[in-house]
Amino acid sequence: NDGRFDLLAGNRGLNSHLKHGNKRLPYLVHGDIGGDGFYDALEARFDVASQRLLPRHQMVTLELLFPFLRENFPTHRQYAAATLQQIFAGQLAGAKLLKASDLASVVLLNRGGRFEARPLPVEAQLTPVNGATVADFDSDGNEDVFLSQNFFAVRVEDYRMDAGEGLLLLGDGQGGFVSVFGHRSGIKVFGEQRGCAVGDLNDDGRPDLLIAQNKGLPKLYLNVLGQAGLRVRLKFNGSAAAGQGAVLRSVYNDGSKGPARLGSGSSGRYSRNSDTQILGAAKRIRSVEVSWPSGIKSVEQVINPALLLELGL
């Protein structure tokens, strides 16, 4: 709640086949490996103890792309004992290496000139994050996060990543989050969640949640957490869409301020939030500060927080 915009970065998580500690580090080897004019990408693991770069795929998978492997390695034992350089002898000269140094989903806190990476709670690391949206779901004046989770489109030799049901994270205003499980939040989506967006669909002053699924119906959750917030709709030159990029911030009766909220239509994966912003009302909101994309700044007094506040230039 310091007025600086932070970043939220979803990742593969720490519970996939790519998980690693200090013993085996995941790499991606990419280039024209087979010499056939096509660009290839192979997953590899660097074994720290033996200082060897090893293939991650089984031979039955790789030989479909590189038939010569069966001739060079008649048995699986021979293949398992070989390094990646030995398997593709003389064919990795033009290839490049990329190291997967961090698989955790994190929040990047803006410290003014630098970002501090802070991992999200462990429940956010159990499965990949495909989408995220930010709102003050419990109206306590601190921004919260919803994460769309799960990924099923994996190879036969890998396991399906389905440990998530959609995760609500309640923020503390200092960059920390607490996981709220489905039996408490009511959010239980067991499919492949993709896009997610928020909007006040029943005009009760609370941000509701819409979640899309791959090969499944979308899920709508009406919010009953906390008290109602302040509804704000921005218009620039008479258009709500032209207000995109404006920054809103609540000013409370005691002079303190809430978090900065960016009026951005985009949300998560191919999703769009409502143009009406819901500002959490932990304390009585006295006014709303707006920094418009044009550089103009304005302050609007809040007379009745129960009414929709429409602001424009």
Positions of predicted regions on the chain:
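Acidic, divalent-cation-chelating loop motifs in proteins
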Residues: 1-2, 30-34, 134-140, 198-204
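Catalytic or ion-translocation cores adjacent to nucleophile or general acid/base/metal-coordination motifs
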Residues: 15
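Gly/Ser/Thr/Pro-enriched helix-cap/hinge segments flanking short amphipathic alpha-helices
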Residues: 18-25, 36, 43-45, 70-81, ...
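C-terminal lobe substrate-recognition/regulatory segment of protein kinase catalytic domains
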Residues: 46-88
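Phosphate-binding active sites in nucleotide-utilizing proteins
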Residues: 143
